[in-house]
Amino acid sequence: MRQMKYQFKFNPLAAAIFTLLCGGSMQSSYADANDSASSVDNKKLKESIQKAYPGQEFFEQYYVEKSSPEAQVRDTRSLSSAFCTGTWITPISPTTQAVPADQATSVVTADYAHYNPNGDSELEGNVLIDQQGRSIRANKVTIDRTQTYANAEGNVQLAQAGLLAQSDQINYNLKTQQGDLKNSFYISEQQHAHGHAEQIQRTSPTEIILRNATYTTCPPEQKPTWRLEAKEIKLNQDTGRGTTKNTKLYVKDVPILAVPYFNFPIDNRRTTGILNPNIGFSNDGGLELTVPVYLNLAPNYDATLTPRYISDRGVMLQSEFRYLTENFGQGKIWGGYLPDDKKYNNEDRKDFNLLHKWKINDYWSTDVEYHYASDKDYVTDLDTNPDSKTDLNLRRAWTLKYKNQIPGLTAQLKVEDFQTLDKTVSDVDKPYARLPQFLLNYVTGNPLGLQYEFNNDTAYFKKNIDDAANYSTQPSGTRIYNQFATRYNFRTPWAFAIPEVSIRSINTFYDQNTVENLGLNSDNKSKSVVVPQFSLDTGLIFQRDGDYLQTITPRAFYAYAPYKNQTGYPNFDTTSASINYDQLFSPYRFYGHDRLEDNNFLSLGVSYSLFDPQGLERLRAGVGQSFYFADRRVTLNNTDDTIDTSKNSGPIVSISSQLTNKFTVAANSAWMSNGDNAQHDFQTYYTGDHGNLYNLGYFNRKNIPDRQLAYDAAVASFVQPIMNNWRIMGHVQFDFRNNVAREYLLGVNYESCCYAISVYGRSYYNDLDDPKDPNVNVKRAVMAEITFKGLGGLNNKLASLLENRVLGFKEINQSWTQR
């Protein structure tokens, strides 16, 4: 038997069919029985084999191996993750853009067609209506005499971009474009989801309601790992959200959650919904349950509310609000509140934080930062943000920046203050506020190698003094720092020489309170010093080509600045520079502008590099040492030490190697003039091709008064996939000085096609804690996270913790979870 094949404009579908059958001017032709406008083989649908699980046969037809020809031609964004054995392939690709109904051409085939002008008209037998971006299959299609109502029955399939449904029957109102499907099984390729509904009702072109329905993103099987069952599921393409009523969440056949209302995403837009809940136990909080709720309030702002139950403390609420304005920048506000903390003397615990950045135009920008906490233990006890740091001093600042308009000119105006959380901290250890600070830097171009530079740092420093006895050592006032420099940059492929001459000055003016508290007169209520400086940086570059490129660069650096007495000058914000290879070739011993160094020294060094043909630096090594021709008399705290009177520094060595593009090792060591090692470290990083990562580091510093604090610690971390879906990960920081692990974390993560589970244990001290203090206890916690993929956004705290502690984890984690 030959099938009839019609081609016509479709608007709406059934009305156009019967307009044609009434004798319209459209063209018709015949097609062979195997002629089809759809590329999907529907053979299995014709076999009518009833299985124990209804719909299984339908689902299996469209769930294919990723190596199949159908999957190979799909956009990879539509394919399921590597954790799935197969992927959904619907008749029409998710990337297909359907032609508007009133402009599209349709092809209709059927075994039999009958037109009745006074009654119902019919298409019967292998009916296929294939439009540009849509298709319908059925055993029979009927339309009433008024061409208002259409009915399709018998293995009915509807397909459009990435969506497919099979039903026993479809009723459709052609005028309102509303209809319903009976006993339907559906597939959403883009969401990797499928399910069943007793009724699917299309209430508008963009909204569908499923009644007595199921939903899962697991592979098709008789008992999926999880599924939603709901009295009603509403899918809205305008909002990109799905909502449910009277919903139960099943794991296998066990109901684990029942909610009257649930909201979940149906596309990749940011949308309101529940994020991954967390459940855990800690030794200082007991049982803990956290259920974050994401609120997509508008395209340019959103919020997250996080109710948190801590059995030994109480009920806490944390929140975060993010915003993006059209003309005034973007920012974030977050905080938390725990009333009557049962583990903290029934005190209210709270914090508040604000970050705002605004690029006013190409030249001006500004930002605001504000942090507040009720007590020094808040971050350690209650803050779950992995980015948070246990700082003793919380920063509050406003900054206005200027750059780019005038070449070489940058400027900054800043107001900065701090909240010192520990009320027992002495005035000496509190930071100064800058009320305000103005920074200006201007560097000219480099015509013929000649360059000029000007720097200004003007600030008013103020500190709140609790103990009047500290007024003499903690003065307030205005400090003005200026630097004028001229340098000549001589550079060739084989050598460089950079002489520089500069003059620097500090002018300090005590404020009226300091003058009165110290009883200063007009002769000593201000301090001024001017110091000229000369430096010369020279080097030779030897290069040898071949299979490997080798370079050797011997370098000499000389600096001279006369001594100017600065005894009694205040120290508002200056610290000693760290000891490293690059510091050998700098004339500045201090970070900050409260001291002007006296210098008369020569540094000698040599560096070596070896590059392979791929550009990897297989070896980089440097060694250097400074030789002093005079004692360094300007000190930070007006005290002398043996370092400032030694004739030379100890040698400093730096070495690193990219053994491969995934494996790097590095080591540094610095000695003092007496032969003692001042500091040394060793680090190695390896990132594999399969989501594995290994980091190891050791860091040791000798205590040098007024220069550096003692530190002796090792850090190690790893991420190791096991089989295809499992991976273990860990991180440890061990303090050898106190013989204690300051932090260790061990977790396991399982990723499947439709769900993920993370379980981890963590033990840690506050960064400010002294483990030897008998009143300080280690904090221990065990947490579990589960994600049902397709039900909400990701909120993986384990991943966030490791991102902030493990170099390279963010990159391998993205490649693992999104593969």
From Swiss-Prot:
Its main location: membrane. GO terms for cellular component: cell outer membrane; transporter complex. Together with LptE, is involved in the assembly of lipopolysaccharide (LPS) at the surface of the outer membrane. Belongs to the LptD family. Residues 1-33 form the signal peptide. The keyword Ribonucleoprotein does not apply. It comes from Acinetobacter baylyi (strain ATCC 33305 / BD413 / ADP1). This is LPS-assembly protein LptD. The keyword Transferase does not apply. Component of the lipopolysaccharide transport and assembly complex. Interacts with LptE and LptA. It comes from the Bacteria. Keywords: Cell outer membrane, Membrane, Signal. GO terms for biological process: Gram-negative-bacterium-type cell outer membrane assembly; lipopolysaccharide transport. It is found in: Cell outer membrane.
